[in-house]
């Protein structure tokens, strides 16, 4: 016998509520008769009239009908596509208020997820001089929409189902962000325009690179068009037909100089990278972040430092200019290979790089057993560094600088270090790597008691 399914009925009418907080994705939160209601484009302290758009057992969703009381932190969004495009979530909030909110989120999560952890000092936030045009890495969806009769290029809409119809992106580097319409119009000229799925963008200190993910082969005429487009716009164009191992550079062809994209994390160091390598999205904040990490490590010429989750050596190589020795450990072997090449190309001789899965036991590894360190830098992915923190006493480091792209996992790991491993949290703060979004980069300093 089939079981009847109960459907919650949507409340009809106009209702009023005060916004008390922001959700993880930037929507306002109101409590209505004890039930959580998510209302986009609202800010804490605002009173709004709203109508329901969706209901479930544990929460409701709604849209604003009228702002009864507006927050002093409200500003006019600088982008005309803000209410539709899901690329940004906080453009209606002043940049000062964005930073304050992110800083408070870090403090709250350290306390609640970290089981009572509180930093002795709050670091002043690292700010960027330009909150627009900062983004040098992005994956842009590509889709032909027959109803619109055109190719869309950009981020998903807020509901996540479709691509947003945009003509520019103000947070992308203008070398790409100002050319969305030009790029989409160009794709329409290709024979397989309906079979291009994605553009992966990476911009170094001088030029943009674009990986074109295609599901059908290009014709020779298409390839000539791609080369011509790349030449006219000073782009490097790569093609990808399947997995990452199928990526190759279409333009420029041959043995050219420079051979790779590159950026300078610190004076005197050039890091070469491929467009699908992980690099930080915001060059300005990245340089400031590296400088702050070096200051917080309080490096002397006799220090031996280990950099875990080191990637291409973004921190490792600048740190090597100040320390006696530095060891970088990274889970992706190809990035380790490139980090070694970069050290050689920059004539840096006091670093070594190793490949290892840092989410598994590492007690049998050469880099763990054959070296001694007194300080550590951690820069893990969103999953955090739980395995490292659970075994931190085996490293016997007196100071840890932890850089995080996820405040929740930083808070969890801080709880391990402070509550279980005899470290104290000296200081913590945020760095505005991602203006106008809910994402934030954080940094924390732990010291052995």
From Swiss-Prot:
[4Fe-4S] cluster binds at residues 79, 85, 88, 169. Transmembrane segments: none annotated. It is an enzyme of class 2 (transferase). PROSITE patterns: SAM_MT_RNA_M5U (PS51687), TRAM (PS50926), TRMA_1 (PS01230), TRMA_2 (PS01231). The active site is at 405 (nucleophile). It catalyses: uridine(1939) in 23S rRNA + S-adenosyl-L-methionine = 5-methyluridine(1939) in 23S rRNA + S-adenosyl-L-homocysteine + H(+). InterPro entries: 23S_rRNA_MeTrfase_RlmD, MeTrfase_TrmA_AS, MeTrfase_TrmA_CS, NA-bd_OB-fold, SAM-dependent_MTases_sf, TRAM_dom, U5_MeTrfase_fam. Its EC number is 2.1.1.190. Keywords: 4Fe-4S, Iron, Iron-sulfur, Metal-binding, Methyltransferase, rRNA processing, S-adenosyl-L-methionine, Transferase. NCBIfam families: PRK13168.1, rumA. This is 23S rRNA (uracil(1939)-C(5))-methyltransferase RlmD.
